[in-house]
Amino acid sequence: MFFTLIVFLTIISSLATFLLLFGDSPSFRNTPIQKLRNSLLSISRDIFQFYHWLDEKLNGQLLKILNWLVPVGYVMVVTVCFQQFLTHTLPMLSSPGLFRLFTIYFSMVLIYASTILATFSDPGRITTINLKSYPYTPNQLIFFDGKTCSTCHIAKPARSKHCSVCNQCFLLYDHHCVWINNCVGYYNYKWFMLFLISNINMLGYGGWLCYWALTPVSWRKITSTNNANKITGIFLILCSIFIVITTLFTFLHLRYIYLGVTTNELDKWSEIDHLVGLGVLYQIEPSIANENYVERAILDGNAVHISLKDERILIDNNNVKNFKLQLIQSVEDDLVNIYDHGFWNNLIERLKW
């Protein structure tokens, strides 16, 4: 019964994780998979609304506590799994040897070390000191000069964003990770990647060890033999499922590095791609207030061109003759991502020491 329950919960949690991570990708648009993801998000929003209501009643302390449930739960589950592995699975391995024992314990220590570093490191809090060496400038397409955070009331550098969970702005903001209850940004992206790689190593190496521990055992007897076989079989199933999800997620981030974007910027570029698809994005010469691109819109039956920064009307019938307007027909061919310096350079920048 316990074995069946673990397998069932593993499959359900794996499907939910897959839907949340990949259900909105272009390949699944307008399919039942995207509809399932939207339904899951709708249920999640209802739950979060209840939490917010209850949080207000408790003077804002509830969500701070709940935010730590996932990382604390993760560490507890991993610790229990390690204990069970050392107690039941390790003795099943014939003559593990010093090197194998070293790699096993090193993999365990690496999990804890990477989790601590990713959880408690500074993502890139904005200060006057670190702004002096910050290398990114606004591209006047998805990031603009003179932008101010409406919450922090500080100037927003290019590629930065305010996190509603942490209630701070961070440099080179990527996303807020619930697994570490911390944002991923300019200074700690390297620790986030180490966290992912250490989990892939744990799942891959752990799954391989469980497989070899079970090799002498008849597979059809796993669920009916001793406790060690059952636990090792559960570990093998868990490792086989979650290594796929973790690896796909890691390769997704490597793809973002290849493209020269962050998770946050991907949405902004999607908006630009949408404008290009509608045929309303234009490049202008000369620039206006340092803006090189405008969006075509219709106001009172007349065509105007508005700012991408704040939607002010920059060009109308009175001054349109003073500018050269060139329609942007392709994001790939007509626009340049100034933050993309090639995969290896992008990787070095993101893994900044």
Task: Cite the ranges covered by each PLM segment.
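Membrane-associated feature with strongest affinity for ZDHHC
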Residues: 1-165, 169-176, 180-353
